Amino acid sequence: MKCLLCGQTMKAVLTFSSLLLLKNDASCLCLDCDSTFERIGEENCPNCMKTDLSMKCQDCQLWCKEGVEVSHRAIFIYNQAMKDFFSRYKFDGDFLLRKVFASVLSEELKKYKEYQFVVIPLSPERLLERGFNQVEGLVEAAGFAYLDLLEKREERASSSKSRSERLETEFPFFIKSGVTIPKKILLIDDIYTYWNNYKSCEEAVGRSGC
């Protein structure tokens, strides 16, 4: 088996549990590539998981003053290795890389069995340009289904906006017609920037009368 990132050949290691449960425990990454990704430690904002903090960050404090309680969970720090991964996966279209974090994401999503998963959508134009929704690929590779609940209108890319423009933008998400909205929803996205993105999805659900 070869590492999905660097192509290095890896030796398959069979464990007792994999033989007993007919489960494939093989990693998609070699040890060198795996070590470049950094897990979020215990020192972080309790609301958004911004790292190197022991208390609520300034952004979350501002949201709290507006009556909004940020509730976000993340697994990895967005370091250079993660930036390179998403550059290849999202922008170069290497769809095979959706499997890289499948086992990690699977273990994390198992904690939310009582929730219905909803993926943050791309606009039709962005989906046509990219060819796939990168978050849907990650969730499917982890072995989970999700609700096709939201749609998004086209807008200027977030990467071309200043921080103030991002915070002021009203993200154009809306609920698809004819769908049933569950009581407990877990919104899933790839990269956390600001809470606006998720807040606008919550508002879309609220506007639907649920």
PLM segments and residue spans:
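Glycine-rich phosphate/pyrophosphate-handling loop used in enzymes and phosphotransfer proteins
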Residues: 1-210
